[in-house]
Design a protein with these regions (language model features):
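Short C-terminal tail/terminal secondary-structure segment
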Residues: 2-15, 157, 247-248, 259-275
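Conserved glycine-rich cofactor-binding loop
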Residues: 20, 27-28
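Substrate-binding pocket helix/loop in short-chain dehydrogenase/reductase
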Residues: 108-109, 113-121, 147, 228
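C-terminal substrate-recognition "lid" of short-chain dehydrogenase/reductases
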Residues: 129, 136, 144, 189, ...
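Active-site helix of classical SDR
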Residues: 132, 168, 176
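Alpha-helical segment proximal to the catalytic Tyr-Lys
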Residues: 137, 181-182
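Residue(s) in the substrate-gating loop at a strand-loop-helix junction
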Residues: 152
Length: 275
């Protein structure tokens, strides 16, 4: 199998022109920031969400933010067989797959029921494995591809208030490593990005589950970090664009020797030299 030429660094310019990227759950938060970063780097980006309305809002946001953005609207629920079939029909070929879709919630450990355990596995793990199974063969045939799975610090430092979420993100690390081995020598890389506590609408809601809802946001954020994430070296929530920067780099030809890894963008939250 012929390997593509290795890219050399010239001012760290990332050019993804000619590449098609799919970012699941890309209508808000980290997914939207990743989609913006990829589009800004020249990729054709498929915007995915469960509803046409949410996808269209994201499309409008990105069109206004990125000059000449090349976007595809792909409303589909990728946790269902029908949704995946719809997505695959609209997007038969993908060069960059970012499995960003995920759910989380705070529930006391002994109150997590069987259905919640199943739901977190199906949404956070199985959807990523399913899409990888669909798109990885085409990438290996073309001798180029990038698969990124958005994990979490909860994968390696499980919070007691959401162990079902931590379980799903730990499983996602194993899925990433396993598929990286399956793609060995093909020119396709598979990596996880371990995101630390990140400032999104969903996280704001989560913070206010643990902090008095009457407390202003800036104070609530600081209180949350001190009381619930004191080991963070950054001592603030990470912005979605900071996660996106790592994903864009890993999606590029510059990251050709990085595969099978779990790369941390966690603000030093995980107290370890290695993941």
């Amino acid at each position: 199998m012929r390997q593509p030429p290795i890219s050399l660094v010239h001012g760290m310019h990332i050019n993804l022109s000619g590449k098609t990227a799919l970012v699941t759950g890309s209508t808000q938060g980290i997914g939207l920031a990743i989609a913006r970063g990829l589009a800004s780097s020249g990729a054709r980006v498929a915007i995915n969400g469960r509803s046409e309305a949410s996808v269209q809002r994201a499309m409008d946001t990105l069109t206004a933010a990125v000059d000449g953005a090349d976007l595809i609207a792909v409303p589909a629920d990728v946790t269902t067989d029908d949704g995946v079939a719809t997505l695959q029909a609209q997007l038969p070929t993908v060069d960059i797959l970012v499995n960003n879709l995920g759910i989380f919630e705070a529930v006391p450990a002994l109150e997590i029921d069987d259905e919640q355990w199943r739901r977190f596995f199906e949404v956070n793990v199985l959807s990523a494995a399913r899409l990888t199974r669909i798109y990885l063969p085409g990438m290996t045939e073309r001798s180029w591809g990038r698969i990124l799975n958005i994990a979490s610090d909860s994968a390696v430092a499980t919070p007691v208030e959401m162990i079902h979420y931590g379980m799903s993100k730990t499983a996602l690390l194993a899925v990433s490593r396993g598929f990286a081995k399956a793609a060995a020598g093909s020119g396709v890389t598979v990596n996880s990005v371990i995101a630390g506590p990140t400032h999104t609408e969903g996280v704001e809601d989560f913070v206010y589950q643990l902090v008095d809802k009457d407390v202003p946001w800036e104070q609530a954020q600081r209180q949350f970090m001190v009381e619930h994430r004191p080991q963070s070296l950054l001592q603030r929530l990470i912005e979605p664009e900071e996660i996106a920067n790592m994903v864009v780099y890993l999606s590029s030809p510059l990251a050709s020797a990085t595969t099978g890894g779990a790369l941390r963008v966690d603000g030093g939250y995980v107290d370890a030299i290695l993941p």
